[in-house]
């Protein structure tokens, strides 16, 4: 995507960015709450069939990515880059979830800003 710098900290994008596909997955507890109908996938427990929290988080990210690519549709599901982050051990879960993809991975560690940071970087 072509960009143009406007000053030191502002970038104007030649074409507006868009989100081709998105998904969210949750554990049993969230699935029992008032937002249950809003989730794409609710696991039967919080472990996603795994034995550790790290493996569970990896499985959760892999499921969310697979669903997002599926919802994006043919052609849109091709990844050029993968931006992901988590709060667990400096992106361990994100790194392991991303290694199955055939594209460059950018690990983000921005705590609460990870989503906004990822969207901004991916737009460029």
What do these predicted ranges mean?
Residues 1-106:
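Conserved "HGTGT" condensation-loop signature of ketosynthase/thiolase-family condensing enzymes
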Residues 108-124:
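Active-site-proximal alpha-helical scaffold in enzymes
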């Amino acid at each position: 995507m072509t960009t143009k710098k406007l000053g030191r900290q502002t970038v104007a994008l030649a074409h507006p960015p868009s989100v081709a596909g998105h998904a969210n997955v949750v554990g049993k507890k969230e699935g029992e709450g008032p937002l249950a109908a809003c989730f794409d996938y609710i696991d039967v427990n919080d472990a996603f069939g795994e034995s550790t929290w790290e493996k569970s988080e990896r499985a959760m990210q892999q499921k969310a990515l697979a669903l997002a690519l599926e919802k994006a549709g043919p052609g849109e599901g091709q990844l050029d880059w993968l931006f992901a982050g988590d709060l667990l051990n400096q992106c361990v879960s994100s790194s392991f979830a991303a290694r199955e993809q055939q594209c460059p991975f950018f690990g983000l560690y921005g705590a609460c800003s990870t989503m906004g940071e990822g969207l901004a970087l991916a737009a460029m």
